[in-house]
Amino acid sequence: MNKTLKTFSLALALVAATCGAALATPSTQIWIPSTDVQAYKTVHLGLDNYTRTSKHNGVTTNTYDAGVTVGVLPFEKLQMEVGVDYMETGTNSATDSSPFYFNAKIGTPEDSLFPYSPALAVGGYNFGTKVGVTTQNITYALAAKTLPVIGRISAGYYHGSGRVLVDENGKSANDGVLLSWDRTMSEISDKLWAAVDYQSGNSGAGALNFGVSWAFSKNVSLIVGYDIYNNAYTGGKNTVTTQLDINFP
């Protein structure tokens, strides 16, 4: 009986991994959440895709994500955003039948609590609607500080569903660290931004990612990045990601 349950759990995890190459996106770096929060009444539209670099063996489905995030608090030192994403692989999988995911975040900017204080954020994402399949239910806490010349360093911790976030053996792999570096490359152009981020763990959520962004205008930018999954059995083949971000107004 235990072996049967373990096999069933792993099967669900692999199904969920077909959408594992994307996050129900709060304000992010390349892959992990950031401490940034959408300003009050700002509506953020994100159009992301994750395209596999190989179609041989393992998880090879591409993932497409359209999301809306809205800033909902009118305060300078305490900000909050909520969002919803429509995410699918186009394969009529179990995850595609429940494509809506929800996220929320509350945070404080740098220097808002006291001089030189870090930015802080707590939130959650990948709150799906199909229990045991899309309910990754990842919660997290992050701190970030911008250092002269170096850029912004972020660190935090996450915890999610032990039923959905599992490794290739069906064992829970539902928590770990969040790390990132990002910086506006002003030596080249104030429109150019670069980032590297990492989410630990052997579930489909674990990955090392890097990319660059170009701001075409104040409200429109495009990220191009590369995602290396910690565990090819659960995360699948590496992906190239493009992420179009548009803010209104």
Segments (PLM) and residue ranges:
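Transmembrane beta-barrel domains of Gram-negative outer membranes and organellar outer membranes
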Residues: L23-T139, T146-V149, G160-R163, V177, ...
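Conserved active-site beta-strand-loop modules that form the wall/rim of enzyme catalytic pockets
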Residues: G151-I153, A194, L222
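Contiguous ligand/interfacial binding patches
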Residues: G201-A215, N219, V224-N231
